[in-house]
Amino acid sequence: MPQLLPFYFVNQISFAFLGLFVLLFVFSKYILPAFVELFVSRMYITKL
């Protein structure tokens, strides 16, 4: 039963943290600035 081996949990935790870090990096670098730019442009358009 591989679920009882300790390195199985270490492997799962390390890949979970790696995936979380990659997801956080991609969101903060590429996806979220586009939304910020969109909201800022909407705000400028409504203030005109």
Curated annotation (Swiss-Prot):
Keywords: ATP synthesis, CF(0), Hydrogen ion transport, Ion transport, Membrane, Mitochondrion, Mitochondrion inner membrane, Transmembrane, Transmembrane helix, Transport
Gene Ontology CC annotation, any one: proton-transporting ATP synthase complex
Membrane topology: Single-pass membrane protein
Domain of life from the UniProt record: Eukaryota
TM helices/strands, residue ranges: 7-27
InterPro entries attached to this UniProt entry: ATP_synth_su8_fun
BP GO annotations: proton motive force-driven ATP synthesis
GO molecular function: proton transmembrane transporter activity
Keyword Hydrolase: no
Any matching Pfam family: Fun_ATP-synt_8
Cell compartments where the protein resides: Mitochondrion inner membrane
UniProt keyword Repeat, yes or no: no
Function: Mitochondrial membrane ATP synthase (F(1)F(0) ATP synthase or Complex V) produces ATP from ADP in the presence of a proton gradient across the membrane which is generated by electron transport complexes of the respiratory chain. F-type ATPases consist of two structural domains, F(1) - containing the extramembraneous catalytic core and F(0) - containing the membrane proton channel, linked together by a central stalk and a peripheral stalk. During catalysis, ATP synthesis in the catalytic domain of F(1) is coupled via a rotary mechanism of the central stalk subunits to proton translocation.
Subunit structure: F-type ATPases have 2 components, CF(1) - the catalytic core - and CF(0) - the membrane proton channel. CF(1) has five subunits: alpha(3), beta(3), gamma(1), delta(1), epsilon(1). CF(0) has three main subunits: a, b and c.
Family: Belongs to the ATPase protein 8 family.
Protein name: ATP synthase protein 8
Native source organism of the sequence: Mycosarcoma maydis
